[in-house]
Swiss-Prot record:
The keyword Cell membrane is annotated on this UniProt entry: yes
Transmembrane regions: 3-23, 32-52, 87-107, 168-188, 191-211, 249-269, 272-292, 334-354, 372-392
Summary of the function given for this chain in its UniProt record: Transport of the pyrimidine nucleoside uridine.
Keywords from the named record: Cell membrane, Membrane, Transmembrane, Transmembrane helix, Transport
A biological process term (GO) from this entry: nucleoside transmembrane transport
Name by which UniProt lists this protein: Nucleoside permease NupC
Bilayer topology: Multi-pass membrane protein
Length: 393
């Protein structure tokens, strides 16, 4: 039965993308089928095989060491505030972002990341039926982040039509940045985080190919990556350290605000209607949770977490998943965890539109106009990845 429901779910989510398509007759079926097959193969390897366990284990172990090194710096500054017997979200989850961001800066300075991004993007362009710019952007978004990636493309932004701009922004919203992957791994199992990273990369291309199909002419398929201003090693290091700290503080501020507001709204709804706001959202999202393979008896609670992620952010939803006492089955936990690993939420519309507008005001206004369609597509990417996990777990 789970296979039947999962297949129906895939058809529904792809169908919802088709309904919103701006050019149904231009959709290229072959790349979509190839990428779906790759999603199933890679997802199965990562979740169900010894090779996958080895790769995920190595990835998680590496990040584990990085988090230990990050703790050295945190302990030095905050001393006794870090209690080994208690978990402080800001100290243990958010502040390591500072160290991870510093490492990314070093790898950028030494041209390691640009090399990896460029050639993985080139390989992806052979599979996804899109231009090299779109493929580069998807890989760069997964490493640099949804706003930082546009800085490397600022020369291209003014030359892009609305269709190509949508694809770039959709890729940025569907993925997550490497600087906060370590934070996710303190809240979710590493295998779910890694699987989501891979599935969302291809899922972003699949949904964008359906919602926003277009052909890139050979003469337009140019990739001119903006070289960063020449800086010394320590200038780059200092810049990325401060960027990492800004991210940690911004996420902390967003969490304080969103968690408090959701608690307030829940209190009002409980007093007036006898059910929390998140409970109502759970019923709204329950059919979608069911379609990704979650049993109906868990669908309402799972749907509540999924909806929380969309209206607030993934950190609030992950906190809800880990701390609210849900006793989900292993399969449901895997599906929900994979769904949560993306930037698909309302606040990301403002972040991406603001990042683009800071580089090109006209294009920033264009992004703001299709913001809801952007969130719609990115959310379908999360549902698609979750449905695939539901089928292969």
């Amino acid at each position: 039965m789970k296979y039947l429901i999962g297949i129906i779910g895939l058809i529904v989510f792809l169908g919802l993308a088709w309904i919103a398509s701006s050019g149904k007759k231009r959709i290229k079926i072959r790349p979509i089928v190839v990428m779906l097959i790759l999603q199933f193969i890679l997802g199965y390897i990562l979740l169900n095989t010894g090779i996958g366990n080895f790769l995920v284990g190595g990835f998680a172990k590496g990040f584990g060491y990085l988090l230990e090194y990050a703790a050295e710096g945190i302990n030095f500054v905050f001393g006794g505030l870090v209690n080994a017997d208690q978990t402080t979200f800001f100290m243990n989850v958010l502040l390591p972002i500072v160290f991870i961001s510093a490492l990314i800066g070093i790898l950028q300075k030494w041209k390691v990341l640009p090399f990896i991004i460029r050639y993985i993007g080139l390989a992806l362009s052979k599979v996804n039926g899109m231009g090299r710019l779109e493929s580069y952007n998807a890989v760069a978004s997964a490493i640099l982040g949804q706003s930082e990636v546009f800085i490397s493309l600022k020369k291209e932004l003014g030359l892009l039509n609305q269709q190509r701009l949508y694809t770039l922004c959709a890729s940025a919203m569907s993925t997550v940045s490497m600087s906060i992957v370590g934070a996710y791994m303190t809240m979710l199992k590493p295998e779910y985080v890694v699987t989501a990273l891979v599935l969302n990369l291809f899922g972003g291309f699949i949904i964008a190919s359906i919602i926003n199909p277009y052909e890139v002419a050979k003469e337009e398929d140019m990739l001119r990556v903006e070289e960063e201003e020449k800086q010394s090693f320590f200038e780059v290091l200092g810049e990325y350290i401060l960027d990492g700290f800004k991210v940690a503080v911004v996420v902390a501020a967003m969490l304080i605000g969103f968690v408090a507001i959701i608690a307030l709204i829940n209190g009002i709804f409980n007093a007036v209607f006898g059910i929390s706001f998140q409970g109502i959202l759970g019923y709204v999202f329950a059919p979608f949770a069911f379609l990704v393979g979650i049993p109906w008896n868990e669908a309402v609670n799972a749907g509540s977490i999924m909806a929380t992620k969309m209206v607030s952010n993934e950190f609030v939803a992950m906190t809800s998943l880990t701390q609210n006492g849900f006793h989900f089955s292993g399969r449901t936990t895997a599906i929900v965890s994979v769904f949560l690993v993306s930037f698909a939420n309302f606040s990301s519309i403002g972040i991406i539109a603001g990042a683009v507008k800071g580089l090109n005001e006209k294009q920033g206004n264009v992004v703001a106009r299709f913001g809801l369609k952007l969130l719609y597509g990115a959310t379908l990417v999360s549902f698609l990845s979750a449905a695939i996990v539901g089928l292969i777990y």
